[in-house]
Amino acid sequence: MATLVLDNGAYNAKIGYSHAHVSVIPNCQFRSKTARLKTFTANQLDEIKDPSGLFYILPFQKGYLVNWDVQRQVWDYLFGKEMYQVDFVDTNIIITEPYFNFSSIQESMNEILFEEYQFQAVLRVNAGALSAHRYFRDNPSELCCIIVDSGYSFTHIVPYCRSKKKKEAIIRINVGGKLLTNHLKEIISYRQLHVMDETHVINQVKEDVCYVSQDFYKDMEIAKLKGEENTVMVDYVLPDFSTIKKGFCKPREEMVLSGKYKTGEQILRLTNERFAVPEILFHPSDIGIQEMGIPEAIVDSIQNLPEEMQPHFFKNIVLTGGNTLFPGFRDRVYSEVRCLTPTDYDVSVVLPENPITYSWEGGKLISENDDFEDLVVTREDYEEHGHNICEEKFDI
């Protein structure tokens, strides 16, 4: 019996058989300006010759799965002959869903997986639980860890003790990658070029040039300097999708510091945007979101737990999700948490080698466990007991 592991994120789906490798595939559909009538699904994005003005159709809104028609089409594509050629008669699935997911969404998920696709057994689980499983497998002497999952829609901070989540201490910050990209679009549109329709391009700009500042005010001073002294400034060459397929940063020695470029390329000059955008993860109040930043929320979450457990959480802080890939992210989280923590506690912040696929790898490990059969709901169970058995078994 094969097991398919699907970390069904709001932006990317991480999918693969438990005995094989993982693929990271957009969990959405696209329409392009040039081919208006055709809808592209998942990794058909690569077929679009001119992705400028790309229009996204997402199954998730504000972190929850609400558009089932789109999700079905993406799954049909992923499970179908183009991709994974799933033989449902002989396949189990491990699938992730958000924390505190609405029961109506959970019921729809059961119906679609069991009744439409007819998987043999299903395990629905939070992505953080898979990450925690992976972490405990790598660190068998540890009993506790706190998972910081900073994804597309939200950032969740979730303490796990012996693989059970501590619901009373979960914190959600309403800042994720989508908000950062949108904020960068607004800043660039206000200061330089109108890019409000260019989500795809600006998302790439964000990933290529943004970083987390270790000293915000010092970097702000550097960003004000003129010419050579301004080490923060970069010139980003935007793609035109004929000769330049993907944007890139001009090498420092080729930058024209005063005057215009002769090459005819379209250039974005970025200075304080590079670190002011990721700063929102640490100070959401900068843009009027009255919430704690990530380091404060980690400390607040741990302080909601019994005192004798707290030191174990401080020394097992695990970062997952796409936003943790900003250069400097781990160091900043460490230094701020260290400042807020009693001196006699050790603080350790772990950034896995691939924080995007970390929870998928946890799912792969769970599928190889001896007790895997006790965790899943089989089709026979579901046909006999319906949604109730899923509610009992799955701790969402």
Swiss-Prot record:
SUPFAM superfamilies named in the record: Actin-like ATPase domain
Keywords from the named record: Activator, Cytoplasm, Cytoskeleton, Nucleus, Repressor, Transcription, Transcription regulation
Gene3D superfamilies xrefs: 3.30.420.40, Actin, Chain A, domain 2, Actin, Chain A, domain 4
Gene Ontology CC: cytoplasm; cytoskeleton; nucleolus; nucleus; Swr1 complex
Molecular function GO labels: nucleosome binding
Chief localisation class: cytoplasm
InterPro entries in the record: Actin, ATPase_NBD
CDD domains membership: ASKHA_NBD_Arp6
GO biological process: negative regulation of transcription by RNA polymerase I; nucleolus organization; positive regulation of transcription by RNA polymerase I
Cellular location(s): Cytoplasm, Cytoskeleton; Nucleus; Nucleus, Nucleolus
Subunit structure: Interacts with CBX1 and CBX3.
Family: Belongs to the actin family. ARP6 subfamily.
Role summary: Required for formation and/or maintenance of the proper nucleolar structure and function. Plays a dual role in the regulation of ribosomal DNA (rDNA) transcription. In the presence of high glucose, it maintains active rDNA transcription through H2A.Z deposition and under glucose starvation, is required for the repression of rDNA transcription, and this function may be independent of H2A.Z.
Protein name, as recorded: Actin-related protein 6
Organism: Gallus gallus (Chicken)
